[in-house]
């Protein structure tokens, strides 16, 4: 039976796609392997915390004792290998979650050291902007170590991180809008080891946006104290309507919660308004959805490369 060409693709394009897919078979196999591992990890966490439909019901008002919300935060902590988690619809995006984490961990007079060059534009406004409420306006300092040929400059990081006033070392896992390679957890672990050697009390913070479930490990499992991201990206599985997360040391997550709500309230309040089910379902699907997104990007890059375009990453 002749198959219908619903999209009106030319025979050349269809053949290019087949050739690209055949070439990418070993890459797709590795992506599937990671997705299978992470799906098992998520399922094991669901079983350990006895997830049931009773956790899907939301709360209104203050949101005290929201069982579904509190359990989901425990699951996130387990998945990332941390002491605590903060998973909230109140985070409007990843930048908001990162901002709460930064302001929670840093005080006036402290210095944040970014070792992956400057953060992306929206977060940079939070850190160095002249707008009211920025870290700069609160007297929190900022320095950076630029990447060397697109990779971490461990020698420069060791020197800069040793300064007494550096209270946080910040890494951006994703390339963001820069032309560089994404950091692997292995590379993040190497940087963490360098920082620990010269400044053991510094908080190591990772912007994990777009990085969740792309490897078997997460940054907090290789030495980072805390990481944050958005639920409308990987961990939401395409189902979470909004929100963000922070995972890490209990004291750091608690301080971030105080920034999200108010000192003395922290994570005790925060109604979920019937959205818990989507957050759970999205997290369950997240490893698979993330894998499909990576496959699509790899496939598109290969087809464009076959057509003569320069692609990055290649």
Which residue stretches match the model-derived regions?
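Conserved PLP-enzyme active-site core in the AAT-like
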Residues: 2-25, 32-33, 41-47, 52-55, ...
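Conserved glycine-rich beta-strand-loop-beta hairpin in the small C-terminal domain of fold type I
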Residues: 314
């Amino acid at each position: 039976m002749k198959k219908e060409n619903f999209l009106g693709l030319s025979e050349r394009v269809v053949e290019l796609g087949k050739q690209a897919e055949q070439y990418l078979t070993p890459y797709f196999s590795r992506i599937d392997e990671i997705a299978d591992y992470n799906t098992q990890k998520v399922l094991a966490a669901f079983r350990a915390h006895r997830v049931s439909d009773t956790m899907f019901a939301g709360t209104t008002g203050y949101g005290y004792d929201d069982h579904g919300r509190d359990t989901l935060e425990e699951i996130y902590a387990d998945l990332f290998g941390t002491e605590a988690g903060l998973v909230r619809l109140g985070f409007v995006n990843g930048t908001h979650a990162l901002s709460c984490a930064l302001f929670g961990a840093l005080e006036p007079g402290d210095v944040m050291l970014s070792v992956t060059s400057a953060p992306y534009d929206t977060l940079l406004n939070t850190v160095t902007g002249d707008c009211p409420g920025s870290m700069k306006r609160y007297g929190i300092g900022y320095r950076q170590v630029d990447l060397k040929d697109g990779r971490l400059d461990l020698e420069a990081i060791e020197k800069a991180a040793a300064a007494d006033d550096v209270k946080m070392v910040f890494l951006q896992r994703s390339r963001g809008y820069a032309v560089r390679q994404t950091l692997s957890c292995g590379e993040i672990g190497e940087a963490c080891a360098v920082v620990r050697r010269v400044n053991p009390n510094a908080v190591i913070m990772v912007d994990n946006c777009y990085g969740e479930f792309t490897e078997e490990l997460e940054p907090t499992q290789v030495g980072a104290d805390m990481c944050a991201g958005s639920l409308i990206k990987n961990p939401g599985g395409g189902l979470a309507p909004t929100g963000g997360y922070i995972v890490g040391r209990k004291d750091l997550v608690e301080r971030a919660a105080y920034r999200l709500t108010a000192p003395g309230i922290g994570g005790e309040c925060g109604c979920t308004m019937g959205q818990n089910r989507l957050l759970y379902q999205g997290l369950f699907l997240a490893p698979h959805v993330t894998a499909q997104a990576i496959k699509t990007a790899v496939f598109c890059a290969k087809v464009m490369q076959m057509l003569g375009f320069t692609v990055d990453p290649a």
